[in-house]
Amino acid sequence: MFTIEQIKDILVEAKKLGTVDSISMEGVEPFLFYPIMVRAVEEAVKLGFRVEVLSNCYWASCPEDAKVWLLPMAENVELSLSSDFYHGESWQIEEVGNAVKAAKELNMKVEILAIKYPKAKAPCPSDIEGAKVGLYDLMYKGRAASKLAEEADKKSWREFTECSCEELVHPERVHVGPLGYVHVCQGISIGNAWQKPFSKIISEYDPYENPILEPLVRGGPVALVEKFSLPHDEFYADACHLCYAARCLLRKRCPDVLGPDVMYGEFE
């Protein structure tokens, strides 16, 4: 997990760039590290950042308790809450409803994120307790590639000639993990913020100098497969699925770019 000093370092470095206006705390579950998360919010707000927190709401056992969890950051945080069949047994998870009720009472901005689920018998609701629900496609990378892709509808691998999920030439966001890796897409590292200042990593970013990003920018996952003459299946669920499968085969050849291990399902 991050230390407070590491978080402060990233925030200060991000401020130096002059192009970053918002910080999102997500991945795993931020509320599992509650005191660190609250402090991180405070530090981000001091520097003038807009702050978003993404959560599955395991902590919202009832609206009253949810208010206690949210109160220390109610004035400074926008909430994005996950509610779908990948996080519960229905589109509308009880704990998410509790969190929305609490957030509304505290005048917090809140939205719901839901991922399409092909086996759902009922349509996804347009709102939960008055909070708008955004419905998004599942991206088949990471665990989704290994656990869910087998049952997905598939297309020819040759159709995936661009990366539609991330802007790789002029990124509008990056992901920073507790090991310091800076990713333009989860699992594709452009540097390590514990080894090189974050602001320098971003200011010196050039996808055409990166062995993995160069083909992805030029022709998507298809170009990545062709550049390295990788073995492949004929059909994949989406571009992320093909890209992830290709990157798994390239990890030993590009260890500085394709890491850390946890991004590829490897745990010590």
Describe the function of each predicted region.
Residues 1-2, 19-33, 47-62, 73-95, ...:
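Core AdoMet radical
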Residues 7, 37, 96:
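Aromatic/hydrophobic pocket-lining residues that form the small-molecule binding cavity
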Residues 10-28, 264-268:
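Short Fe-S-cluster ligation motifs
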Residues 12-18, 41-46, 67-76, 98-105:
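Acidic (Asp/Glu)-rich catalytic clusters
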Residues 34-37, 64-66:
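Metal-dependent catalytic neighborhoods of phosphoester/phosphodiester hydrolases
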Residues 71-208:
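Radical SAM enzyme [4Fe-4S]-AdoMet core and its adjacent flexible, acidic
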Residues 193-268:
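Flexible mid-to-C-terminal extensions adjoining Fe-S/redox cofactors in radical SAM and related proteins
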